[in-house]
Amino acid sequence: MLLYIILGLLILVGDQLLKGWIVANVSYGALHTVIPNILGLTYVQNDGAAWSMLAGQQWFFYIVTIIAVGVIGYLFYTSERSEKLYRIGLTLMLAGALGNFIDRLHLKYVVDMFQLEFINFPIFNVADTALTCGVICVFIAILLKEKVTHD
């Protein structure tokens, strides 16, 4: 259990520290190339979801996040200790959801900063990455579990 708590806290604290650094050191809207033609930093304030969908609908995001945190907590609590990949995925999802929730509560928007320069993709942050990786881990864990039960 301690591993999951440490992992979640590292992601959550890292997300918040990086967001604070971005706000203090990167000009709003300006692209700063990190890896040419691959990755840049662009500070944006996102009051919606990816591609600014549902912009300004903060109460929607509050409600969805509270429900998601409850469901993730329940799934973690009821999972088997041996389901490590599944639990890691849930931990990543929880840390990501809480990282963006903190922004929404404190700032009324989410600080995003990573911009992929080689594709038209929404600017995102550490919390978004944790959420995405968590969903992938949970999906793989479920597929692997189904494969074992069918064999």
Curated annotation (Swiss-Prot):
It comes from the Bacteria. The chain crosses the membrane at residues 3-23, 59-79, 85-107, 123-143. One of its GO terms (cellular component) is plasma membrane. Pathway: Protein modification; lipoprotein biosynthesis (signal peptide cleavage). It is a multi-pass membrane protein. It catalyses: Release of signal peptides from bacterial membrane prolipoproteins. Hydrolyzes -Xaa-Yaa-Zaa-|-(S,diacylglyceryl)Cys-, in which Xaa is hydrophobic (preferably Leu), and Yaa (Ala or Ser) and Zaa (Gly or Ala) have small, neutral side chains. It is an enzyme of class 3 (hydrolase). InterPro entries: Peptidase_A8. The active site is at 112, 128. The keyword Protease applies. It is found in: Cell membrane. Its EC number is 3.4.23.36. Keywords: Aspartyl protease, Cell membrane, Hydrolase, Membrane, Protease, Transmembrane, Transmembrane helix. One of its GO terms (molecular function) is aspartic-type endopeptidase activity. GO terms for biological process: proteolysis. This protein specifically catalyzes the removal of signal peptides from prolipoproteins. Belongs to the peptidase A8 family. This is Lipoprotein signal peptidase. It comes from Latilactobacillus sakei subsp. sakei (strain 23K) (Lactobacillus sakei subsp. sakei).
